[in-house]
Regions:
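Electrostatic, structured charged patches in enzyme active sites and in nucleic-acid/phosphate-binding
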Residues: 1-131
């Protein structure tokens, strides 16, 4: 029996990475950081922990008679974690490797919202390092 070409070109299902809490994480690094942040929340160091928070990247400006993409959503930035630490909101992203599109989205987010994104990296043996 011969199979047609489309039966061979089907992609294999990608396994979902789930943590011990049942939440689907994008990477093992993000899952480890999420577990660490949950421990910090239980200990009272941080509060209001949220995961995968989407921020629309839309420009709302008009210059005289010219409107530049007024109210049009161009893209969105998804922060890995958002939490409150010492009364301040912290927006955090876990990166093993930061590619150019993600760097650009972070820069656009920081310019539009006026908030700094904390990028965390996992270093073997030493824990988490802020970039």
């Amino acid at each position: 029996m011969t199979k047609s070409w489309h039966q061979y070109s089907k992609r294999a299902p990608v396994p979902q990475r789930t943590g011990p809490d049942g939440f689907v994480y994008d990477s093992a690094t993000e899952m480890r950081r999420g577990m660490d942040l949950q421990l910090l929340q239980r200990g009272g160091v941080i509060s209001d922990l949220q995961r995968q928070v989407k921020f629309p990247l839309e420009f709302k400006c008009s210059c005289g008679a010219i409107q530049v993409m007024a109210g049009k959503r161009i893209a969105h930035y998804t922060a890995d974690f958002v939490y409150t630490e010492k009364g301040r909101r912290v927006i955090e992203d876990c990166k093993g490797y930061a590619d150019e599109p993600s760097k650009l989205r972070i820069r656009v987010f920081e310019a539009l919202y006026g908030e700094k994104v904390v990028i965390m990296k996992k270093i073997r043996g030493t824990g988490w390092v802020r970039e």
